[in-house]
Amino acid sequence: MIYLRKANERGHANHGWLDSWHTFSFANYYDPNFMGFSALRVINDDVIEAGQGFGTHPHKDMEILTYVLEGTVEHQDSMGNKEQVPAGEFQIMSAGTGIRHSEYNPSSTERLHLYQIWIMPEENGITPRYEQRRFDAVQGKQLVLSPDARDGSLKVHQDMELYRWALLKDEQSVHQIAAERRVWIQVVKGNVTINGVKASISDGLAIWDEQAISIHADSDSEVLLFDLPPV
């Protein structure tokens, strides 16, 4: 089964300094049909105006991933980290027993565009941590998150994998799905056809009870592929 979550059907909140689209229920957006998918709890597509950002606030027992698409985010947290995360890089934070952090757009002229993704951990009460990394493969399917941090990927405390998959126009490829696993695909750019279903930038696809995904790039495209545990 494939369910297409169209970009314009997501929850939307424009706060002036922040324009945010919510794939799943978040803050004042609530839809009981979209509370998450497997271990995925939040996919927020955020545009933050120059000099603006999220002030210091707490989190607990959540894996929080940021993928910067445009601009740079300045991260500070209660573990003493102060880092700049430029476009193309991923950062992950295990909130675990508790953490406080802020995320700002340090530019005085340029906007910041990012995905903020929350993943429920396999267990609560883990030690907080922070990592960031650039993945340099321009094309193909590259492992970004895994439970064992293999092949240079970032560690995630969950039985899941995240791939960044970049394809040139008319390229076609296949991803096998293990029994009972679930897959979420988020289209970062371009237009793709997945098992016959057409999707475009900012669309999402929930996939279950499928043995494989066949993806065709209708234009130069990039997707995030989440290989998730059974429900």
Swiss-Prot record:
It catalyses: quercetin + O2 = 2-(3,4-dihydroxybenzoyloxy)-4,6-dihydroxybenzoate + CO. Keywords: Copper, Dioxygenase, Iron, Metal-binding, Oxidoreductase, Zinc. A divalent metal cation binds at residues 57, 59, 101, 103. The keyword Lipid biosynthesis does not apply. The keyword Transferase does not apply. Pathway: Flavonoid metabolism; quercetin degradation. GO terms for molecular function: metal ion binding; quercetin 2,3-dioxygenase activity. Its EC number is 1.13.11.24. Binds 1 divalent metal cation, Zn(2+), Co(2+) or Fe(2+). InterPro entries: Pirin (IPR012093), Pirin_N_dom (IPR003829), Quercetinase_C (IPR041602), RmlC-like_jellyroll (IPR014710), RmlC_Cupin_sf (IPR011051). Its cofactor is Zn(2+); Co(2+); Fe(2+). Pfam families: Pirin, Pirin_C_2. SUPFAM superfamilies: RmlC-like cupins. Is composed of two structurally similar domains arranged face to face. Belongs to the pirin family. Has quercetin 2,3-dioxygenase activity in vitro. Its physiological role is unknown; however, may provide a mechanism that would avoid inhibition of key cellular proteins, such as DNA gyrase, by quercetin. Quercetin is a flavonoid compound synthesized by a variety of plants, including foods for human consumption. This is Quercetin 2,3-dioxygenase. The lineage of its organism: Bacteria, Pseudomonadati, Pseudomonadota, Gammaproteobacteria, Enterobacterales.
